[in-house]
Amino acid sequence: MKPLCLSIVAFLFLATLTPALAIEQPRIVPRANEVPKPIDQVFARLKKYFSDPSVSHFQLVSADPKTRTIVAKQSSVDSASWNNWAFCKTGPVEMIYKYADGSATVTVKLEKTTKHSTFVSVAADFQGAYRLGSNENKVACESKFVLEDQIISVAGASDAK
């Protein structure tokens, strides 16, 4: 009888403890695809794209040719682009707030796969500002993967999904 009782207690303990230890899914999930172009060509193309605000509306933050990593940021994202790129999980009170401003920071990592092929990974971090009167709430938002796919297309992928 004692082993049965211990088994039941152990089961109840694990049943209540396990949900508390559940791992939350990451908010920033990278998108990736292979581009049939040499890595130096892809790096130069993306660096030029992010360096020209009239083309991409992004500001180049850094471009490291050694690690083949590019970071760019766009502030003051218009609401049409925002609705296309990201969604924000808010509480019931914040649901009546209106989108006021947002920023998107993208990190592009390149890896050489073959002499004429590059693996491109794009991760986007979205931060939204929502207002109701004088109250403002900043929210870390999740991607719809549209922006990441656009950047992978700019890199030269024929099917950016």
Locate predicted features.
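Ser/Thr-rich, low-complexity intrinsically disordered terminal regions
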Residues: L21-K161
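Bacterial N-terminal signal peptides
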Residues: S7-T16
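Positively charged n-region of N-terminal signal peptides that target proteins for export
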Residues: M1-L4
